[in-house]
Amino acid sequence: PVRIRSSPRFQPLPHFFIMAKLERLVIHCTATPPGREVSAADIRRWHTAPVSQGGRGWRQVGYTDLIHLDGSVERLVPNNEDRTVDPWEITNGARGYNATSRHIAYAGGVAADGTTPCDTRTPQQKSALEHYVRDFVARFPGAAVVGHNELAAKACPSFDVQAWLR
């Protein structure tokens, strides 16, 4: 099983969404250069800070979990670990798919220049992601595992998820 540590400062969303069936796991990268660690606070700031302050202005972060460089997995948004996506579990990872998805990101995904997409996963991150995906598939049979780039015109997660799954 994957060990996940909780992140502080969780803020639930208002309960105006209808609960939906979990249909997929979406794999993301943080679009940071190799070796740069990313914290839950970084993700929160990037995603929820007002646009005027350099953020995206979202109500919630884009990922359920974050895989750090050392392979540890940090929970950013708590969930019930069941097949239903409750309103407070919804993250903003892929427009049009969020109510039926969980999202995981690994720290990295771009070359040292900070812009060129590049699979920068460390061996520890690759192992953690493999265990995470295997656990997800075992717990939620029939749910898809996709890269963000399969749902939107993005390079994220900077590797071919379907080829990797084979």
Identify the meaning behind each predicted range.
Residues 4-10, 16-30, 34, 57, ...:
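Basic/polar, cationic surfaces and motifs that engage anionic cell-wall
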Residues 40-49:
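Short Gly/aromatic-enriched secondary-structure transition segments
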Residues 49-61:
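Conserved active-site loop region of the serine DD-peptidase/beta-lactamase
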Residues 51-53, 89-92, 129-131:
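Glycine-rich loops and low-complexity Gly/Arg-rich segments
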Residues 78-92:
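Short acidic (Asp/Glu) patches
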